[in-house]
Curated annotation (Swiss-Prot):
Protein name: Probable protein phosphatase 2C 42
Superkingdom of origin organism: Eukaryota
InterPro entries linked: PP2C, PP2C_BS, PPM-type-like_dom_sf, PPM-type_phosphatase-like_dom
One record GO biological process: signal transduction
Region (Disordered): 328-352
Keywords, comma-separated and alphabetical: Hydrolase, Magnesium, Manganese, Metal-binding, Protein phosphatase
Family indicated by similarity: Belongs to the PP2C family.
Organism: Oryza sativa subsp. japonica (Rice)
Binding sites annotated in the UniProt record for Mn(2+) 2: 62, 267, 312
Cofactor binding note of this UniProt entry: Binds 2 magnesium or manganese ions per subunit.
Reaction equations catalysed: O-phospho-L-seryl-[protein] + H2O = L-seryl-[protein] + phosphate; O-phospho-L-threonyl-[protein] + H2O = L-threonyl-[protein] + phosphate
This enzyme's EC code(s): 3.1.3.16
């Protein structure tokens, strides 16, 4: 179990901000370390994941126990979605399978070098992370077992023409604004929620309240996450049945003319700002002509100056739907005249 970070007396409010867009949407992202001693969040914004299907990808990864798994997901998960056989025909299933694929990749020796590079600056990683190579004492020689006590929650959004598909594991959240009404497109996954508790107990675990949160086996305070492989070692259970599962909850929605924007953010934002408060904040600034990047930075500043303030890392992605005239037809024309080039390696921003 990861040791809690010692909070900073003065928060680091330096913000890493990026913006971009295409013919149908504009976006901005911003991240801030805040009161935490290290930055463990990561995110990916890829407005042109696939030209043939007009698919965009946005994801927030909230790390715990270190930043390595969050950064690894930000670097790889969107590519795994693109590689799925169902990518063109069943976006929801492609997204679901990609979450499971991340845990599979983390168990593979090939991931060790990249993960170690990402985690080299984290004190917990340097100390507890050495147990990776000692987790199978019955085997002669070192055995790689993946990140046992480090992981991340993940909230990912895929946008394709008029389709919005959200995959979520953990307590990051996606909220859309429809005519000013905040509508959650994801549910938080906490150990004390009945469906989550049922799975945890069935897997032989327990849920208890300690250190201000409900926890799985007195450890992790979320019930779904990528990584944290020490909770996923029961070989008699399928991945979705483990104490902690990376199985995402999938929600789908239709992009309509009254869908204004969506916000993806980690729990550091939602812990102090309600869904409707965030939508109202964004709408007010949009109506005043404020740039998306400034809105994102202002939202993080709002969260850290609340009473009480957010004491967590904070990351936010804001996607505004442009609804240009002829938008639907323009997308169809782009798809039908495409040369087949898939620009998955550009028009993207990945915050590691």
């Amino acid at each position: 179990m990861a040791q809690p970070q010692r909070p900073l007396q003065v928060p680091d409010i330096t913000k890493s901000t990026h913006s971009g867009g295409n013919t149908v949407l504009a976006y901005a992202s911003s991240a801030m370390q805040g009161y935490r001693s290290t930055m463990e969040d990561a995110h990916a914004t890829i407005e042109n994941l696939d030209a043939l299907t007009n698919t965009s990808f946005f994801g927030v990864y909230d790390g715990h126990g270190g930043s390595a798994v969050a950064r690894y997901c930000a670097n790889h998960l969107h590519n795994k979605v693109l590689e799925q056989e169902d990518f063109s025909s069943n976006l929801a299933n492609a997204l679901r399978q990609s979450f499971f694929r991340m845990d599979e990749m983390l168990r593979n020796q090939a991931a060790s070098k990249e993960l170690t590079e990402y985690g080299s600056g984290n004190e917990y990683w340097r100390t507890a992370g050495r147990s990776w190579l000692r987790c199978a004492p019955c085997v002669l020689g070192p055995v790689y077992c993946g990140p046992l006590a480090e992981g991340c929650t993940a909230c990912v959004v895929l946008i394709r023409n008029t389709q919005i598909v959200v995959g979520n594991a953990g307590d990051a959240r996606c909220v859309i604004s429809r005519n000013g009404q905040a509508i959650a497109l994801s549910n938080d996954h906490k150990p004390n929620f009945p469906e989550e508790t049922q799975r945890i107990v069935a897997a032989g675990g327990s849920v208890s309240f300690s250190r201000g949160s409900h926890r799985v086996n007195n450890g992790i305070a979320v019930s779904r996450a990528i990584g944290d492989l020490s909770y996923k070692n029961n070989k008699k259970l399928r991945p979705e049945q483990q104490l902690l599962t990376c199985s995402p909850e999938i929600r789908a929605d239709q992009l309509t003319d009254d869908t204004e924007f969506l916000v993806i953010a980690c729990d550091g934002v939602w812990d102090v700002l309600a869904n409707q408060a965030v939508v109202d904040f964004v709408r007010l600034h949009l109506n005043n002509g404020v740039e998306l990047s400034v809105i994102c930075e202002s939202l993080l500043q709002e969260a850290i100056t609340r009473d009480p303030p957010s004491t967590d890392n904070m990351s936010v992605i804001l996607v505004r739907f442009l609804h240009p005239e002829g938008n639907r037809g323009a997308r169809a024309a782009t798809s039908s005249t495409s040369t087949g080039t898939v620009p998955s390696r550009h028009s993207k921003s990945i915050s590691l």
